[in-house]
């Protein structure tokens, strides 16, 4: 692990904490996602890594490698210096139609590529879309922890995803087409960019998941009067927000929609995108699937110490006091992660209650 040096912490997610690291030789910056060794290393983690490794597209965060430390499994990936698209909307309030289209075109291009590779994301949301640091930012899809490859795994059945973005069919306990659920989530992302609010959340009571679920099932949304968007854009949203996934617009159809095609950058045209779909398109990873699976299997063994140690088990990060502070920071971040997981559990509980009550009906 002498290859990397720490630059700074960059936050926490569903499975662990993340740090910005620098490759000592090349000075290249990478984002390093840390997942504590032991029971947290499950099939979702393995799936995320294998799925991510297979993807090579400019609108998808590049996977680099996995590394085992004494306490954590570390996943190295491309660093997106522009941060989350979510943060950009929070500071802007909402986007103009042209700006929303600019990012939506990139999102659809990335999702289209994932689907062609037989991978559906299942947790598309603004927080999982990052931006690079260029003046005209390039959108990057990240976080494949909930993705499901139809080549390697069974059809999606579990209820995952973020309440505000979740498609009606995901709330039913029947099997669903993960690709069509991704289309719905892309529609929610577009709506949020245009309006600055979630389409199916009650603004007065956003934590009321039951109300959100009911509005999703009834496809109850509206464009506020103060938001002026074209009829073309309204038409696209109305074709995405369709409860019956068989009648919903597909990714291929979105790519032919007049609103999508307006001002489409040359690099996003079908001709330019064709290069990424070639079988010989190599992976960015230097590790084979077998090497990765062995490292992930080894990571299932819990760390020898009960508490996290400084540097995530890499050592060499300053004096002993520094290490203790580092460990406390890590523990605080992991506590935050656990709190987020509790929120997920609360959501799952609500979904189960709705299932049990028989309120969910898919036409």
UniProtKB/Swiss-Prot annotation:
Key word Kinase present: yes
Tissue: Expressed in seedlings.
Composition skew (Basic and acidic residues), residue ranges: 348-363
SUPFAM superfamilies (alphabetical): Protein kinase-like (PK-like)
Catalytic reaction equation(s): L-seryl-[protein] + ATP = O-phospho-L-seryl-[protein] + ADP + H(+); L-threonyl-[protein] + ATP = O-phospho-L-threonyl-[protein] + ADP + H(+)
GO molecular function annotations of the record: ATP binding; protein serine kinase activity; protein serine/threonine kinase activity
The UniProt record lists the keyword Transmembrane: no
Any single Pfam family the record assigns to this protein: Pkinase
Domain (Protein kinase) ranges: 4-260
Keywords: ATP-binding, Kinase, Nucleotide-binding, Serine/threonine-protein kinase, Transferase
Family: Belongs to the protein kinase superfamily. Ser/Thr protein kinase family.
Protein's UniProt name: Serine/threonine-protein kinase SRK2A
Organism, as annotated: Arabidopsis thaliana (Mouse-ear cress)
